[in-house]
Amino acid sequence: MARISFDRRIQFLRAQMIDDGFQSRPGDYTPFGSRLWAAKSEISDGEKFSAGTIVPNLQSRFTVRWSRLSASIEHTDRIEAEGRVYAIVGIKEVGRRAAREFTTALVAP
């Protein structure tokens, strides 16, 4: 794995399930696990264009070291970093349990 600068802290968020007796549905997002050190890189417009997606929002990649917490993160979870909330749109393992990479789209500023 290339040298990565883990220079910011992120918090994973998970929706709490609400059961009203008739159905279960996701509720508010609350912190899940502890804060982790991560590396962040922005996805360039050229990369979006070559992938065939023209999306008018900010897309970023967050890379964290592999851990049981990072391995348990799902597409339905979110990431909070630097006062912004990002929806996870893709998850990739880097190396053999070296790191996990989360492709995200900005949800709230």
Explain the meaning of each model-derived region.
Residues M1-P26:
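Active-site-proximal polar cores
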Residues I4, R25-P109:
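Short, conserved turn/kink motifs that form compact alpha/beta structural patches or helix kinks used as
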